[in-house]
Amino acid sequence: MNKKKTPNNIEDLLSLFSETLTPADVLSAKLMAQFSNAITSERLNLNMSQKDFAKHINATQSLISRWECGDYNFSINKIAEIAAKLDLNVDFKINKCH
């Protein structure tokens, strides 16, 4: 009996598709997941519902939902705009992979 392993994190999930994803696809997915998680964490730290959080930063609840579930391709400008509204620092580190 061959039991399939359920992915526990983004790396496990991405490894399932490693033959069809480029390294850029993998990196992009990881970065979007990190930013989505940061937005969700900040909302939860503020003890706000998605609806209240949307009002707080002048967005819609459906947009907050898309941000949090990773169904949004953030531009650098959008990341900067969200971070400024939430008084968050964004730090990109660029290093050699190997």
Locate each region found by the language model.
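Helix-turn-helix DNA-binding elements, focusing on the entry/boundary residues of the two helices
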Residues: 39, 50, 61, 76-79
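Short alpha-helical DNA-recognition segment
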Residues: 47-65
